[in-house]
């Protein structure tokens, strides 16, 4: 068990459970809010085939998460979609989480890669849909699945 003091002076206890994953304790409750998220480009265009766009996409998602207190456990940017596991604040619902990540990352991408406007003149980089589920105790299996995405897509 580890004890850390957070920025507001409250005592935050971190407890190791299930495969070494750290869970947070706030007062009388213990838990985490790990989410496996998949978001795809609009029309599944392979926009991240370009190494430049792929790098900017990674940086834009990292910045969006940092600004909103969302911790990225793993992030894999594929040619037409992104897989990630994030640990978000426990009060944040899935729809808000996706809105923050897709909205700010899209806004950043259109400013640093101006040529994206040729493909997406309406300013929608991401598809309207998404996949988001709680990871729970399957963290190691989900992490390995995301880690092996290049190999998974190479065999298809």
Can you describe what each PLM-predicted range is?
Residues 1-156:
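Charge-rich, low-complexity N-terminal segments
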């Amino acid at each position: 068990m580890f004890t850390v003091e957070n920025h507001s002076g409250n005592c935050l206890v971190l407890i190791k459970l299930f495969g070494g994953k750290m869970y947070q304790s706030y007062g009388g409750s213990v838990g985490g809010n790990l989410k496996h998220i998949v978001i795809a480009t609009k029309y599944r265009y392979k926009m991240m085939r370009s190494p430049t766009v792929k790098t900017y996409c990674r940086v834009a998602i990292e910045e969006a998460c940092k600004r909103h207190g969302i911790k990225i456990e793993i992030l894999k940017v594929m040619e037409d979609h992104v897989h990630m596991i994030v640990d978000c604040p426990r009060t944040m619902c899935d729809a808000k989480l996706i809105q923050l990540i897709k909205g700010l990352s899209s806004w950043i991408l259109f400013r640093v890669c101006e040529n994206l406007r040729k493909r997406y003149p309406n300013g929608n980089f991401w598809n309207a849909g998404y996949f988001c589920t709680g990871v729970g105790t399957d963290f190691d299996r989900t992490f390995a699945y995301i880690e092996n995405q290049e190999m998974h897509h190479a065999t298809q």
